Amino acid sequence: MAPNIRKSHPLLKMINNSLIDLPTPPNISAWWNFGSLLAMCLITQILTGLLLAMHYTADTSLAFSSVAHTCRNVQYGWLIRNLHANGASFFFICIFLHIGRGLYYGSYLYKETWNTGVILLLTLMATAFVGYVLPWGQMSFWGATVITNLFSAVPYIGQTLVEWAWGGFSVDNPTLTRFFALHFLLPFLIAGITIIHLTFLHESGSNNPLGISSDSDKIPFHPYYSIKDILGLTLMLTPFLTLALFSPNFLGDPENFTPANPLVTPPHIKPEWYFLFAYAILRSIPNKLGGVLALAASVLILLLIPFLHKSKQRTMTFRPLSQTLFWLLVANLLILTWIGSQPVEHPFIIIGQMASLSYFTILLILFPMIGMLENKMLNH
């Protein structure tokens, strides 16, 4: 029999073992589609970003006009920009759903895969933040000012840290240039960490909705899941293109149509929608350092999840009490997102504080307690 190049060639062999002959559980649901969707988002963002970078000028006096020029005068420049801006939103929608799936089905028990995933989330957040500054509109400028200023809360070295990040005594040209450099670099770092993420995943194989071993009953990835991934992609592409083509500015801030002006502060400074939950937690603590610590904890808490798993069952499929708590957490995050978009006044302040408190309470206290309670109930 002739040797199969797919299985013998050093490079093709790696692709084959990851995407073609990969043994996969036969019962993974559509919730397992988001990994491939995230990969597609990353590819789309890198390609559109590369095309935008060809027409962008990282200079405070030219950045805003260079983006306007791209949209007006470059062939399909408006389309490339709208795909890139809304692609970021879909990237976050997919990663939030992907993390939600991991929480619900106990995928976090693959600790290395989970931890590299958290690192990916942090890198994605950093990339989105520096990217938002590049068009140099009002919200770009003031968002950069407010968020970089948070570093000054670090005891002793805070102010030095901020000035070092700014490259001066305020957000100015050096800040914009370095943010562009970082925004160009980080997606490739994300691609690298993604490969590590997949390497760890393929060490153990995929989890499944039942949370039990499927080693005795695996099927090849291709054609079963390759076709399912293509279906998932078309289903994501429909709302994505609808948004990017029919209402491209729906998720953006109107303030960003005004060029950056250091002398005029916008009435409400708020980040893009995908950061609002963390922004609400930051604002709910009236102390600067406390707020920064809560902000960091709101994402880094994910690293603790594997250690807070007290249930004898891996997934929540057969745990109705934990399911209720999970959906309570989802509702809580939606409330935080809404609060983050509102001005700092009554009743939003107290709602934000209650929602922030319940966010940490659910994750740190209630999940482990309910897990142990369910174990006890199973014994009776």
Curated annotation (Swiss-Prot):
GO terms for cellular component: mitochondrial inner membrane; respiratory chain complex III. Keywords: Electron transport, Heme, Iron, Membrane, Metal-binding, Mitochondrion, Mitochondrion inner membrane, Respiratory chain, Transmembrane, Transmembrane helix, Transport, Ubiquinone. One of its GO terms (biological process) is mitochondrial electron transport, ubiquinol to cytochrome c. Heme b b566 binds at H98, H197. Heme 1 (or BL or b562) is low-potential and absorbs at about 562 nm, and heme 2 (or BH or b566) is high-potential and absorbs at about 566 nm. Component of the ubiquinol-cytochrome c reductase complex (complex III or cytochrome b-c1 complex) that is part of the mitochondrial respiratory chain. The b-c1 complex mediates electron transfer from ubiquinol to cytochrome c. Contributes to the generation of a proton gradient across the mitochondrial membrane that is then used for ATP synthesis. This is Cytochrome b. It comes from Coturnix japonica.
